[in-house]
């Protein structure tokens, strides 16, 4: 096996486990680290057959992740649920949630074509595609509901960025001191954002982009669609500027999505998710820099978060 670099090497037990789930005559010939995720280490495994052809699988390894067994069980269950729904998700090959066979809890799945696209170019084309894909996810009606959503950020855990608009942030924190508004539950991805969506897009034709896959289903939940909308909006705001966060919410409605009926209810979910980023700016910005957005330093992302929260609090309605 040839590794692209030392980091790409699959741990011995995980390699043996993955190999046991190949077709007769196949073997793993190459591995490659896939960047962009936060929850798990992700590697592409190139699988060679006797006849000379190859196919790819993806190995997700949950190293040092609290509640890894739970995360992995949820993702495996979601992948089985999504089969046949029309949502472009990976197919489940095997799961080892308790690390009975691997060094760490691991998940083996099919590889989807495409790549994540985090560049500014072509964003006006991709935002409506993201919105339509999220509407399709929310249209899923599972026979068995996933667990209810969990929102861990509280008014007391918010970290106000240095130099932030104190008035806007105080008002935003006061918003999430209130009880959550009532909602009609739907199936949620719960981590839907550009880093978890794969596109087929030619560099010379960014306007011809199409979505080929949605990945990282470990946080699937049941809850208000506004949570998913808010999460993607916040990611877009930090990646591309606050205006794009607000634009995504509009695009979701234009695509047929049904957010909360009142502006105050929508604001609650948007603010809650935006403030959650205040606790993990370093964590979320590192994969973006690894993916080529080197200008997105922690400070730049903090400034964009401040501008986004301020824009939410200044928005009419």
Task: Annotate each PLM feature.
Residues 25-33:
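Short secondary-structure junctions
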Residues 32-149, 182:
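ATP-binding pocket architecture of kinase catalytic cores
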Residues 35-47, 53-54, 58-59, 92, ...:
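Active-site acidic catalytic loop and adjacent metal/ATP-binding pocket
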